[in-house]
């Protein structure tokens, strides 16, 4: 909900970051990273949690430019996002809910450029606030990564739009307030 100034910004932005547990398309991220020379960091969860959340990741065959690290808690996400140049949220298209929201909103709040898969987590919500790519398309993801990595103006413009969007969304207190308001509207005849 609240990020300290130290958590928000870093002078060093030196990799492409991805993480998450629910309905992540890590194979597409890995294949996209094989097509670019930029460093990547994949923050992974316990295998049991990933499997339960329909996420598959093979850490045995990563390209040389991708490092995998095990998630050690929510603060590690903040630390890794802070040092990322780009945050990628690769999502599986076959889900009936919107995964990836917490990762992309946290990254946006930290003024990071986000690349995210088109789907329920983006449709009707995002336009200029993120770079949106087709699902299960490593070539399109690699092209977006290269474009964002090399185009400072695009990266900064998208990150600034994303930051404004994340701030408009509010936070946990706003979410709880909205839930209470909707429940009250439903209960009143």
What are these regions (language model features)?
Residues 18-22, 45, 70-71, 93, ...:
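Conserved donor-binding loops in enzymes that form glycosidic bonds
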Residues 85, 107, 111-112:
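A short alpha->beta transition loop at the rim of the catalytic pocket in nucleotide-sugar-dependent
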Residues 44, 52-86:
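Nucleotide-activated donor-binding/catalytic signature segment of Leloir-type glycosyltransferases, i.e.
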Residues 6-24, 30-41:
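Conserved donor-binding/catalytic core segment of Leloir-type glycosyltransferases
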Residues 153-184:
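A charged, aromatic-enriched C-terminal amphipathic alpha-helix characteristic of glycosyltransferases
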């Amino acid at each position: 909900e609240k990020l300290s100034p130290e958590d928000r910004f870093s002078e060093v932005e030196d990799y492409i970051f991805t993480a998450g547990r629910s309905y992540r398309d890590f194979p597409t991220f890995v294949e996209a990273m094989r097509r670019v020379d930029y460093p990547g960091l994949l923050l992974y969860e316990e295998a049991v949690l990933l499997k339960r959340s329909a996420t598959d990741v093979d850490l045995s065959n990563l390209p040389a430019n991708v490092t995998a690290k095990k998630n050690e808690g929510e603060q590690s996400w903040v630390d890794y996002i802070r040092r990322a140049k780009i945050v990628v949220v690769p999502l599986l298209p076959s889900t009936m809910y919107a995964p990836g929201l917490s990762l992309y909103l946290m990254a946006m709040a930290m003024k990071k450029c986000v690349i995210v898969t088109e789907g329920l987590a983006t449709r009707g919500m995002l336009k200029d606030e993120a770079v949106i790519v087709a699902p299960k398309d490593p070539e399109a993801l690699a092209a977006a990564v290269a474009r964002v990595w090399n185009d400072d103006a695009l990266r900064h413009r998208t990150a600034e739009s994303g930051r404004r969007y994340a701030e408009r969304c509010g936070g946990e207190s706003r979410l709880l307030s909205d839930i209470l308001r909707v429940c009250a509207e439903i209960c009143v005849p």
